[in-house]
Amino acid sequence: MSLSASEKEENNKKMAADKAEMGRKKRAMWERKWKRLDIVKAFASLFVHFLCLLAPFNFTWPALRVALIVYTVGGLGITVSYHRNLAHRSFKVPKWLEYFFAYCGLLAIQGDPIDWVSTHRYHHQFTDSDRDPHSPNEGFWFSHLLWLFDTGYLVEKCGRRTNVEDLKRQWYYKFLQRTVLYHILTFGFLLYYFGGLSFLTWGMGIGVAMEHHVTCLINSLCHVWGSRTWKTNDTSRNVWWLSVFSFGESWHNNHHAFESSARQGLEWWQIDISWYIVRFLEIIGLATDVKLPSESQRRRMAMVR
């Protein structure tokens, strides 16, 4: 008796998970050599979370507004620029606007565009396998955050960053890669200069930490819990309640089904703030070559009900 398409998909996922579990032993944080970049990343993360602990003692209403601005500007920089524009080339904008959006993403303190885009492209190339940079098969906390602090493991899995030659050819992205730390330090200094500890703890603390964890939830939670609408060979899920906070990124099953789509909230009721921005830019003539899934693609990927 032949298996249905859905049964075959479930079997393939189980086999892939079993293979990953057998083929790669989870490595504890203390069981490997820490590279200098790992230490810098870990220190930065600890510092941001330390600022969060100080934030309640430095609360002001202007500081809360700064936190919301940092969260929004940095978050949209990640979703609109790093993710949809640079990683997937789902739309085009003039270079001055592309570079501006990318700089907004830099302020989210999630790395420079070359580093972020390369990791994300490897995630789609090796989704849920033992070569996935933040594979959910290695545990929730690994896929959520711990993978960030093991760059040697990332190289072991994926090799060198050879999948971002389009960005490496541009002086601007190479400049940001070389100087990312100086931009972050300047950002922190400006927050302190204009608002003291209140702006620093709420802007670089609360604002940045919230955006970090929302982004991390896309890698962890959205491969564990939620609904599936499309036949993808992975564990991607749609998590509706995270859509507002993630600016539309949590329609993750939609995204894995149609990676190059500029729109991830494919239904009218699926909130996707990043798409609203891209659509507005398209209406006023600044965004071109905006990619969306065709009806034939949607029919081919739809779950059998």
From Swiss-Prot:
Gene Ontology molecular-function annotations: metal ion binding; oxidoreductase activity, acting on paired donors, with oxidation of a pair of donors resulting in the reduction of molecular oxygen to two molecules of water
Keyword Lyase: no
Deleted gene: phenotype: No visible phenotype under normal growth conditions, but mutant plants display enhanced freezing tolerance upon cold acclimation.
Location(s), subcellular: Endoplasmic reticulum membrane; Plastid, Chloroplast membrane
Regions crossing the membrane: 39-59, 60-80, 180-200, 268-288
UniProtKB keywords: Chloroplast, Endoplasmic reticulum, Fatty acid biosynthesis, Fatty acid metabolism, Iron, Lipid biosynthesis, Lipid metabolism, Membrane, Metal-binding, Oxidoreductase, Plastid, Stress response, Transmembrane, Transmembrane helix
UniProt-annotated binding residues for Fe cation 2: H123, H223, H252, H256
Pathway(s) the chain acts in: Lipid metabolism; polyunsaturated fatty acid biosynthesis
Keyword Membrane attributed: yes
Topology of the protein relative to the lipid bilayer: Multi-pass membrane protein
Protein role: Involved in delta-9 desaturation of fatty acids. Involved in the production of very-long-chain fatty acids (VLCFAs). May desaturate chloroplastic monogalactosyl diacylglycerol (MGDG) and alter chloroplast membrane fluidity, which is required to prime a cold acclimation response.
Similarity remark: Belongs to the fatty acid desaturase type 1 family.
Domain commentary: The histidine box domains may contain the active site and/or be involved in metal ion binding.
Protein name: Delta-9 acyl-lipid desaturase 1
Encoding gene per record: ADS1
